[in-house]
Curated annotation (Swiss-Prot):
Segments on the Lumenal face: 36-205
Short name of any one Pfam family annotated for the protein: SPRING1
Glycan attachment positions: N67
Bilayer topology term: Single-pass membrane protein
Gene responsible for this protein: SPRING
Localization (cell): Golgi apparatus membrane
One GO CC term, this protein: Golgi membrane
Top-level taxon of origin: Eukaryota
The protein's assembly and partners: Interacts with SCAP.
Protein name: SREBP regulating gene protein
Function summary: Positively regulates hepatic SREBP signaling pathway by modulating the proper localization of SCAP (SREBP cleavage-activating protein) to the endoplasmic reticulum, thereby controlling the level of functional SCAP.
Stated family: Belongs to the SPRING family.
Regions crossing the membrane: 17-35
Length: 205
């Protein structure tokens, strides 16, 4: 009887250790993701500070990812999505289908490249990841170049900091002011992530 009780106790203790381990790993993952997202937001807020420029802005954006010095088997991605992730090649996938090298698994049926699901003709999308993926389409280059040439002073520092098409789309979809009607009100509460030049249609309050 004593041996049976000891065995049951050991099993319970082992399960508690497993649960504690799972909880600890989940907590570390959550804190890491939150820290990265906050770090990026702080960087953007700092870059948005207005400065005067007497000369044309020396844009550094490179639209040809093939010239990148980054290893070809590694991908940057949008990082913070809870369910979806977009990699720098324009693929959107579920977070569970993200490979260890940071790229979406293109062999999974749900992975799509240059996906504009939920995006309007104005260039505003219902999901951040689809906004970035759609923005990465090669035919969006001229639109983005026009935007860079007309960027408001308040955004000049932000977009001077980006170096390629992917970074530009990440910043454009995340910081667009075109989707905002008032400080805490979106013109379209659904399609609020914008890479385009035109604001979304204004929804009545």
């Amino acid at each position: 009887m004593v041996n049976l009780a000891a065995m049951v106790w050991r099993r319970l203790l082992r399960k508690r250790w497993v649960l504690a381990l799972v909880f600890g790993l989940s907590l570390v993952y959550f804190l890491t993701s939150t820290f990265k997202q906050e770090e990026r937001a702080v960087r953007d807020r700092n870059l948005l500070q207005v400065q005067d420029h007497d000369q044309p802005i020396p844009w550094k954006v490179q639209f040809n990812l093939g010239n990148s010095s980054r290893p070809s088997n590694q991908c940057r991605n949008s990082i913070q999505g809870k369910h979806l992730i977009t990699d720098e090649l324009g693929y959107v996938c579920e977070r569970r289908d993200l490979l260890v090298n940071g790229c979406c698994n293109v062999n999974v049926p749900g992975t799509k490249q240059y996906c504009c699901d939920g995006c309007l003709s104005s260039g505003c999308c219902s999901a951040y990841e689809y906004c970035v993926s759609c923005c990465l389409q090669p035919n969006k280059q001229l639109l983005l170049e026009r935007f860079l040439n007309r960027a408001a002073v308040a955004f000049q520092n932000l977009f001077m900091a980006v170096e390629d098409h992917f970074e530009l789309c990440l910043a454009k979809c995340r910081t667009s002011s075109q989707s905002v009607q008032h400080e805490n009100t979106y013109r379209d509460p659904i399609a609020k992530y914008c890479y385009g030049e035109s604001p979304p249609e204004l929804f009545p309050a």
